Amino acid sequence: EPLAKWILALNKGDILVEAKKYLNDDVLNVEAAIQGALDIIAEDIADDIKYRKFLKDMLYKGGILKTSEKKKHDDENKVYEMYYNYQEKVKTIVSHRILAINRAEKEKVINVNIEGDKDYYLQYITRGVTKNRETNLLPYIQKAVEDSYQRLLFPSIEREIRKELTEKA
């Protein structure tokens, strides 16, 4: 955690030199120390209410709910054919369509996901973490932001939105 704080403070020093200070029986090399710090930063980003609210708002306003047909499925009567390759804005999708999409997904006919402007979201979060300041640690911060978004933040917010859409329907 001290190395994560050091990175987030946007120190000017050499991260490799700094990381050596945190080697011990559990952290055997510099790469492990840096990765551990980036994991902590990623988790902090994913838990940050500001980034969660931002992403949720952006996906509600501009996100697209997309469906795609699974290669193997039992929809011989083509009940869900309309949803084999379907997309609609999250903000405009109507209740009966949400329920039909959920049924098709539950019956393993389609995959469902929400898409948005990932590059913009990553840029916003990175600017927030760096407070818009220049830093030689930017590649590390970007790696933590990307990891947080892919592994933690986006899947969590996507589930929240899908759950809320279903509850509303």
What is each residue range found by the language model?
Residues E1-A169:
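Duplex nucleic acid-engaging cores and interfaces of nucleic-acid transaction enzymes
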